[in-house]
């Protein structure tokens, strides 16, 4: 059964289709929004062998012409050179402003292709077909697009909403356990920031999700997308409430920078650690009971996920150096670093009233005996 989450943004409204076998239905799902029967697809070297043929056969069956560009897999692809390569591909394929381009892949491909679509001819339409759990519940929804800079993650980009999102639950079966759990870090985030009953549901159903229960996976994706859509509609360009979606990300982005955006730490793993540290910081500031971070850590550990900096392999910078890396975060306003803290599970809020010493103590404790 396919479920649809509508994102009501006026003339930029779109639907998120969630269900099994959607890749095989891509022609009938994308066809109605095309001005002409032609699309340009961008994917990566991991996704292409697994899913590109199913997509192109579905498009062909609907009489839709297509061309494909396969980029290297990995975070390093979110860069100027690959953005330039993608735009050259679109221009060579004579993509017009009314045309549609397709992002087939995880968050890296979705972010890159969305940004290319935003700046090509001052904006062309694009469809997200997210192939990772992380992309299905987070990066494919809401219109944030962009690339990384040497100074930090996602510092160059634009808000550009997709015209449609196809979240095929079946493609999640091809993920490694590590990649699935990395995406699960973003799923847990939704329960932690504003939906305690959903977090309870995850405590009960997390094992089934990891084991491949398609019905449970569909429900987790639906609830996550519904929550994100509601927040995006209230605050599309992150002037207020949307910042709540960055729960755990201030810590996460510093950890990603410290590990060189490498496979030492996947984004969703950083989010999971970041959420645990955000709740620990909240407890030390007296904002929430100690029971809250303990419960967060217990669930993440039960799922076999990283919860502390000491879980990251290799040498890490000092707590002071990590705090300095946090200063490159997009949530810095007038030089003031904003944190997403919590009063309880499901009750996150934005504040700049966070003691540097408390954050340093949390970082030091999380590093364990490795703290310098």
Locate the predicted segments by residue.
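ATP/NTP phosphate-donor binding region
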Residues: 1-100
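Solvent-exposed alpha-helices and their adjacent loops that cap or buttress functional pockets
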Residues: 8, 33-34, 94-96, 119-121, ...
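Generic secondary-structure signature for well-ordered alpha-helical cores
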Residues: 92-95, 161-164, 170-177, 185-197, ...
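A glycine/threonine-rich phosphate-anchoring loop and its flanking beta-alpha core
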Residues: 115-208
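C-terminal charged capping/lid subdomain of soluble metabolic enzymes
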Residues: 3, 185-187, 287-372
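Active-site segments that bind and position negatively charged phosphate/pyrophosphate groups
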Residues: 200, 204-320
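Short glycine/serine/threonine-rich phosphate/pyrophosphate-binding segments
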Residues: 108-115, 136-137, 254
């Amino acid at each position: 059964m396919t479920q649809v989450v509508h994102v009501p943004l006026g003339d930029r409204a779109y639907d998120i289709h969630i269900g099994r076998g959607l890749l095989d239905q891509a022609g009938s799902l994308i066809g109605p929004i095309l001005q002409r029967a032609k699309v340009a697809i961008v994917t990566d070297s991991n996704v292409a062998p697994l899913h590109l043929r199913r997509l192109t056969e579905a498009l062909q069956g609907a009489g839709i012409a297509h061309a494909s560009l396969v980029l290297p897999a990995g975070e390093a692809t979110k860069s100027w050179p690959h953005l330039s390569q993608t735009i050259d591909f679109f221009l060579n394929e004579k993509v017009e402003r009314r045309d549609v381009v397709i992002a087939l892949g995880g968050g890296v491909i979705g972010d890159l292709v969305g940004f290319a679509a935003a700046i090509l001819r001052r904006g062309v339409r694009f469809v997200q077909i997210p192939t990772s759990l992380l992309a299905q519940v987070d990066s494919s929804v809401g219109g944030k697009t962009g690339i990384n800079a040497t100074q930090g993650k996602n510092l160059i980009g634009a808000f550009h909403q997709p015209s449609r999102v196809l979240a095929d639950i079946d493609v999640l079966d091809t993920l490694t356990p590590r990649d699935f759990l990395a995406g699960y870090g973003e799923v847990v985030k939704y329960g932690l920031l504003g939906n305690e009953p959903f977090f309870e549901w995850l405590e009960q159903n997390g094992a089934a999700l990891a084991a491949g229960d398609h019905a449970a996976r569909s429900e987790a994706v639906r609830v996550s997308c519904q929550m994100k859509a509601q927040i995006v509609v209230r605050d599309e360009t992150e002037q207020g409430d949307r910042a709540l979606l960055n729960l755990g990300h201030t810590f996460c982005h510093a950890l990603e920078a410290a590990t060189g955006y490498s496979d030492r730490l996947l984004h969703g793993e950083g989010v999971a650690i970041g959420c645990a540290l955000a709740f620990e910081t909240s407890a030390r500031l007296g904002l929430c009971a100690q029971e809250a971070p303990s419960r967060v850590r217990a669930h993440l550990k039960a799922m076999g996920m990283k919860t502390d900096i000491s879980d990251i392999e290799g040498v890490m910078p000092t707590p002071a150096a990590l705090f300095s890396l946090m200063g490159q975060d997009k949530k810095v306003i007038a030089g003031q670093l904003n944190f997403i803290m919590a009063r309880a599970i499901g009750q996150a809020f934005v504040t700049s009233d966070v003691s540097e010493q408390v954050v340093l103590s949390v970082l030091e404790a999380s590093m364990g005996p490795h703290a310098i």
